[in-house]
C-alpha cells in the first residue's frame, strides 16, 4: 500500500524513489513489525489472561514446567497480525510470491488457531485431531506445490540445488518437485511446532533463519548477484525479503514477551504458520538443503520425536529420556535457559554455514 503511494508521489518528487529499493523496505518492514508487536503485545496478553486462554502442562514432563500452567497462549496471533499488516504496507502487492506466502502462512495459522482454540477455550485436551490437522496441512501444501510447479518459468526452477558445489543441481521434474515442496512445507511447519516447548526456543531460530532467507531471496531475485554467486535467478523473488524482514521484526518483539519467564506462549497458531512460511520461501528461492542446515535445531527436534516413537513401537524402549530433544536435556539436568541459549548458539553457527554456501562453491 505504502509502496504504491510512494511510487505515485515519486512521479513528482524523485526523492521518494528510494522506497522502490527492496533493502530499504526490508529494514522498514522489520522496524514496523517490531513496533506493531510492541504496541499491541501488552494489550493482547492482558486480553488472553482475562479470557483465561492458558496453556496446560504435561504432568509427565520436567517438574520445573508445572509453574508455566495457565500462562497465556495463542500469542502467535500477535506475530501473524504484525507480519500481515507490515507486509501489506511495505511489499509490492502485485507480486505473486508475496500473496502465495501470505496465504500459506494464514492457512497454516488457521489450522493452528483451531487446534489451540479447542484445547484452551473448549478444554478439549486433544485439540484438533491429528488426522484432521495433517489433512488440511496437506491440502494447503499440495496446492502451493502444484501452483509453483505449474508456474515455473524455466526447468531449472524446479531443480534441487546442491550447496557448496558450483552449478550442481538435481533435476526433479514436476512430480518430484511437488513431493519435495510438500515435504518441506509440512515438515518445516511441524518441526517448528515441536521445537516450541521452551521459552524463546523456537522464535529466535525462526528470526535468524528469516534474516538469512531475506538475503537468499534478495540475491535470487537479482539477476546479476544470482549469476555471480551461481544460484538460480528467480524473477520477483527478491520481494520476499520484505516479508522475511517483517517476520524477523515481529519475532524479535515476540521474544520480548516470550523470554524466560514467558508472559505468553506462541501456540500452534504461531508455530505452524511460521514453519510453513519458512518452508514455502525456501522452496521459492530453491534452497531446501540449506534450510535443513540452517534449521538444524528444528530438524533434530523433529527427528528425536520420530526416533522415539519408532523405537518404542518396534523395540519397546525409548532412545531419549523424553522427546522432543529439548526435554531430554532438561531431564539430564540442564536448566531451561541453558538448553535455549545453547540451541540458539547452534543455530547461529548453522545459519552462518548456510549463508556461506552463497560464496563457497
Curated annotation (Swiss-Prot):
Name its co-factor(s): Mg(2+)
Q: Give the reactions, separated by semicolons, that this protein catalyses.
A: UDP-N-acetyl-alpha-D-muramoyl-L-alanyl-gamma-D-glutamyl-meso-2,6-diaminopimeloyl-D-alanyl-D-alanine + di-trans,octa-cis-undecaprenyl phosphate = di-trans,octa-cis-undecaprenyl diphospho-N-acetyl-alpha-D-muramoyl-L-alanyl-D-glutamyl-meso-2,6-diaminopimeloyl-D-alanyl-D-alanine + UMP
* Primary enzyme class: transferase
Q: Which gene encodes it?
A: mraY
* Classification lineage: Bacteria, Pseudomonadati, Pseudomonadota, Betaproteobacteria, Nitrosomonadales
Cellular location(s): Cell inner membrane
**Could you tell me what this protein is called?**
Phospho-N-acetylmuramoyl-pentapeptide-transferase
The family this protein is said to belong to:
Belongs to the glycosyltransferase 4 family. MraY subfamily.
GO cellular component: a single term: plasma membrane
Question: Ion transport: is it a keyword of this entry?
Answer: no
Q: Which residues cross the membrane?
A: 28-48, 73-93, 97-117, 134-154, 168-188, 200-220, 237-257, 264-284, 289-309, 338-358
Q: Per UniProt, what is the membrane topology?
A: Multi-pass membrane protein
Q: Please cite one Gene Ontology biological process associated with this protein.
A: peptidoglycan biosynthetic process
What EC number(s) does this enzyme carry?
A: 2.7.8.13
Amino acid at each position: 500500500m505504502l509502496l504504491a503511494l510512494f511510487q505515485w508521489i515519486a512521479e513528482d518528487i524523485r526523492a521518494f524513489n528510494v522506497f522502490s529499493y527492496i533493502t530499504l523496505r526490508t529494514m522498514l518492514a522489520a522496524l514496523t513489525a517490531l513496533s506493531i508487536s510492541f504496541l499491541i503485545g501488552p494489550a493482547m496478553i492482558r486480553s488472553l489472561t482475562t479470557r483465561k486462554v492458558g496453556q496446560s502442562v504435561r504432568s509427565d514432563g520436567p517438574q520445573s514446567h508445572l509453574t508455566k500452567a495457565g500462562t497465556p497462549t495463542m500469542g502467535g496471533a500477535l506475530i501473524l497480525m504484525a507480519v500481515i499488516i507490515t507486509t501489506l504496507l511495505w511489499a509490492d502487492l502485485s507480486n505473486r510470491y508475496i500473496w502465495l506466502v501470505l496465504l500459506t502462512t494464514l492457512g497454516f495459522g488457521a489450522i493452528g488457531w483451531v487446534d489451540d482454540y479447542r484445547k484452551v477455550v473448549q478444554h478439549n485436551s486433544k485439540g484438533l485431531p491429528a488426522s484432521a490437522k495433517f489433512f488440511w496441512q496437506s491440502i494447503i501444501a499440495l496446492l502451493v506445490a502444484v501452483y509453483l510447479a505449474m508456474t515455473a518459468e524455466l526447468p531449472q526452477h524446479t531443480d534441487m540445488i546442491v550447496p557448496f558445489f558450483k552449478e550442481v543441481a538435481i533435476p526433479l521434474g514436476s512430480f518430484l518437485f511437488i513431493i519435495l515442496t510438500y515435504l518441506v512445507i509440512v515438515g518445516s511447519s511441524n518441526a517448528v511446532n515441536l521445537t516450541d516447548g521452551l521459552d524463546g526456543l523456537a522464535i529466535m531460530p525462526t528470526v535468524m533463519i528469516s534474516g538469512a532467507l531475506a538475503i537468499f531471496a534478495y540475491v535470487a531475485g537479482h539477476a546479476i548477484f544470482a549469476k555471480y554467486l551461481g544460484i538460480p535467478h528467480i524473477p520477483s523473488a527478491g520481494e520476499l525479503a520484505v516479508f522475511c524482514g517483517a517476520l524477523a521484526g515481529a519475532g524479535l518483539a515476540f521474544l520480548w514477551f516470550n523470554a524466560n519467564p514467558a508472559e505468553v506462549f506462541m501456540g500452534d497458531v504461531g508455530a505452524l504458520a511460521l514453519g510453513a512460511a519458512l518452508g514455502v520461501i525456501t522452496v521459492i528461492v530453491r534452497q531446501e538443503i540449506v534450510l535443513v542446515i540452517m534449521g538444524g535445531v528444528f530438524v533434530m527436534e523433529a527427528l528425536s520425536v520420530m526416533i522415539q516413537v519408532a523405537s518404542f513401537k518396534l523395540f519397546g524402549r525409548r532412545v531419549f529420556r523424553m522427546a522432543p530433544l529439548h526435554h531430554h536435556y532438561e531431564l539430564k539436568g540442564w536448566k531451561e535457559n541453558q538448553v535455549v541459549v545453547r540451541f540458539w548458539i547452534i543455530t547461529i553457527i548453522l545459519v552462518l554455514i548456510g549463508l556461506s554456501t552463497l560464496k563457497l562453491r
